[in-house]
Amino acid sequence: MYNAFLQRTAEAIFALGKHIQTSDRFRTAAFDDKLKCAALSPCFDPALTNRETMADSVQWRIIDHCAAVTRIYAIYEQFVHEMVREHLGLLQGILPFSQLPGAIQTSYRLGLSKILEKKDGPRYADLDLSKLVDGYGLALRGQAYSLEPRAILMQEQNLRLPELHRFMSASGIEGISAWIESHRAVRDFFQAADRLGASAEKELSELIKYRNDASHGSIDIGDILHVNVLLEFCDFILAVCEAIAERVQLAGLQALKPHGHVTERGRITESLKADTVGIGKMIGGFSKGLTVYLCGETYCLERQVVSLQLNGVDHETVRLGEGTEVGFMFDGPGKKNSIIMVIEEPSGVNAMLDAQGLEAVHA
């Protein structure tokens, strides 16, 4: 569901890490006079090492420090907003407004009132007020609707863990704080080495403190973080984003399940080949290429079925009327004891309304 978004975020974080290391190496070499050309003729522009055209070493480090902590926080905040947008888009494309989680319905109503209150400001100047109000009326009347994400995406502070928890809860995504702290990627991060903070909450608070200081210009030589700490923040935010993506994914599945749009097909009881092969008793239809979700109390993995076997025989497609043992090969590691969940082909809100004989009116 969100693997592509996570991959794009990972690429942005990797790019930042490369920049941090490259800038550090180049600065060190430039000021240690280690940038030499082995050829008889110059192999690079001598201006690159001209002290008159370079910031001094301390100012260079301050600039790199500020750029790094500002960028890594921006990547994190953007990812959170992106996940909430996608979560809302998934649900509104399938469920009538009345079937959305109560937290979303309440947050949307309150968010609309804040937009109306601040409509004359620049932040919401592009919104058509009449369409916004009419669209909400359609949603309340059980007709086809489209949510304005900005009514939900209202954060009161920087996204420290308590604020992230509040922000996600308002979007119908509960328990994000405990989920992040217990997620395997975050646990692996803290187990790998001594960290600036002793928990995800403290590590995130440290990052935001440095980011805010950088934004306000209150940085001196004693505040500059070593390149290894900047890279630590990169690794940390990548782990946090992985945890968030899985929690949002699971929240979407759980919201759709009571209405029949997601079904549990069985449990993986045996894992082989570095967990890429899973075996368990299943029910329903499966095919090669099918996207499935392997879910547990602290994870929700999106995987594609690469191959499947029934009684040791490969099949392109199987349809099981009762619990039958099936072997899967996935495109990535799974987990033993995970529950396999599948999103059923959605009819969408418009089709549901048509089936009910209701008029589907678009905002």
Residue ranges of model-derived segments:
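Non-transmembrane, amphipathic alpha-helical segments
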Residues: 1-4, 8, 57-72, 192-199, ...
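Charged alpha-helical initiation segments
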Residues: 1-67, 82-87, 94-95, 100
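Amphipathic, Lys/Arg-enriched alpha-helical patches that create a basic surface
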Residues: 5, 12, 16, 163-213, ...
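Charged/polar positions within long, soluble alpha-helices
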Residues: 21, 77-88, 212-220, 242-253
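Short runs of predominantly hydrophobic/aromatic residues within well-ordered alpha helices
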Residues: 65-72, 76, 80, 84, ...
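Broad gene-expression machinery/nucleic-acid interaction feature
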Residues: 70, 211, 325
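Helix-loop junctions and short alpha-helical segments
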Residues: 71-72, 79-193
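Beta-strand/loop-dominated core regions that host nucleotide or nucleotide-derived cofactor-binding catalytic loops
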Residues: 260-363
